[in-house]
Amino acid sequence: MSENEIKGILGTKLGMTQIFDEENRVIPVTVVEAGPCVVSQIRTVETDGYNAIQIAYGEIDPRKVNQPLTGHFKKAGVTPRRHVTEIRMDDVSGYEVGQDVTVEIFNDIKFVDVTGTTKGKGYAGAMKRHGFAGQGAGHGNQAAHRRVGGIGAAATPGRIFKGKRMAGRMGNDRVTTQNLKVQKIDADANIILIKGAIPGNRGGIVTVKTAVKGGAHA
């Protein structure tokens, strides 16, 4: 497994706090309980067309696992887990089914990408959802202060283009925040402190992977 290989782990967002660095500056950090995960499957170019490892995370009552997944975990020789995801990589030779994946894989990593599901906001207007400025407060405005305004053109094209920014359901999207600094790792507690905010609620499931841009080892 090369030094620049993509590494990843599933975890739970516990919340935010702040710590002090070596120069006594306050650093806002997100606390993530990362792993431990277990490798439940290995995909290779020969069998699947690409290289990846499948990792499983989180406790679950075996009675709540459906039969296909029960058989999948039984074949791998691991106890059923609640969450499963794949981490694509160029070389999977350093992994084997049943191997534990812990937060220690990030010991030499400086920057990571974090993927999670953002907080759902429900149905929201265009000002909240897209940051529209709104319309004038006076000068003949008839109760349209927060409305979108004109959304069409003329007889040609005679329709509203797809993707037009309007009111609608906001949040609950899968989002990746890139190039976040790894501030500290506590291997004994399976904790990783990541500088800044990451997507999602407290208790949300996130995927932490080595940064694909900017150099994870920078």
UniProtKB/Swiss-Prot annotation:
Q: Which InterPro entries match?
A: Ribosomal_uL3, Ribosomal_uL3_bac/org-type, Ribosomal_uL3_CS, Transl_B-barrel_sf
Pfam entry (one): Ribosomal_L3
Report whether DNA-binding shows up as a keyword of the record: no
Entry's Gene Ontology BP terms: translation
Q: What keywords were assigned to this record?
A: Ribonucleoprotein, Ribosomal protein, RNA-binding, rRNA-binding
Gene Ontology cellular component terms for the protein in this record? cytosolic large ribosomal subunit
Q: Name one GO molecular function term.
A: structural constituent of ribosome
Q: Which domain of life is it from?
A: Bacteria
- Transmembrane segment boundaries: none
Q: What sections of the sequence does the record tag as coiled-coil?
A: none
Q: Which PANTHER family match?
A: 50S RIBOSOMAL PROTEIN L3, LARGE RIBOSOMAL SUBUNIT PROTEIN UL3C
| Entry function | One of the primary rRNA binding proteins, it binds directly near the 3'-end of the 23S rRNA, where it nucleates assembly of the 50S subunit.
Describe its partners and assembly state. Part of the 50S ribosomal subunit. Forms a cluster with proteins L14 and L19.
Family designation: Belongs to the universal ribosomal protein uL3 family.
HAMAP family for the chain: Ribosomal_uL3_B (MF_01325_B)
* Entry-linked NCBIfam families: L3_bact
The identity of this protein, by name, is: Large ribosomal subunit protein uL3
State the species of origin: Corynebacterium glutamicum (strain ATCC 13032 / DSM 20300 / JCM 1318 / BCRC 11384 / CCUG 27702 / LMG 3730 / NBRC 12168 / NCIMB 10025 / NRRL B-2784 / 534)
Q: Which gene encodes it?
A: rplC
